[in-house]
Amino acid sequence: MTSPVDLEAPSVPTDGEAIRPKKYRWLREIGVVVGFYYVYETVRSLADHAGITNHAYSNARRLVVWEGWLHIFHEQVIQQAFVGATWFIRMMNIYYGTLHFVITAGLLVWMYRKRHEGYKEMRNLLGLTTALALIGYWLFPLAPPRLYKCNNNIPVPGPDGFTLGKCFVDTLDKVGGLWSYHSPIAKAVANQYAAMPSLHFGWALWCAIVLFRFGRHRATRVAAFFYPLLTLFAIVVTANHWFLDAAGGAVIVLSAVWITRLHQRRGDRQRLQRVRSSA
């Protein structure tokens, strides 16, 4: 008589096991993100072509008029209220030059390791937001406030003689931070007229979406609310962006969300049709 054979049901991965990233897949993700950012920087630099300067300043003059119509042309007032506090402006310069990358990259890593079920969606949303920003840089080159000349370029008397009169202080150059647009490296790679839309503000909104959707603590919700506001203040007080640049950043994020959801609904319909056809 043969001995009975114990039959065991095949093991079914739990939810956590099913979504856990495979070993070394993170290397591929690093390659995807770094490669995409390299393409982004290359295309953004190509947008800084010959003849763009006059176009960028013309657009800046138009934007100032638009902000005047909307009663939001207050960037100079805000900067003048804080520019005397050198330590504070230097802190804002460091904030502007670092957290834009550090927090965004940190949240990507956190999503990959702790909220992997939503990582791909959020990664694609960030990539689409960044790609839409490139379209804005090509279509609407814009001189930021720190480069904007006042008085319609009519020389006016000042303590150092007749000058064109600058509305804004280039805080990265005058006060300092971790880097400056006048450094050799920045001059070689930076497109100073890639201001509309503000990707600083757009990425900050992306971070807020991640924290609101996937954060499980009240502190993360509070951070999600205040981080975009603090970023808006930083880009304005350092004279790197206009208020309408931030509005443009919000537009590309909302557009990316809409496109992403449209793509998801289309995919859901296609999967449903395949299930019905196979039934």
Outline where the language-model segments fall:
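Short, conserved phosphate/pyrophosphate- and ester-handling motifs at nucleotide-, phospho-/glycolipid
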Residues: 100, 200, 245
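Membrane-interfacial alpha-helical segments at the cytosolic side of multi-pass membrane proteins
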Residues: 105-112, 201-223, 251-260
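Membrane-proximal cytoplasmic C-terminal regulatory module of class A 7TM GPCRs
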Residues: 259-279
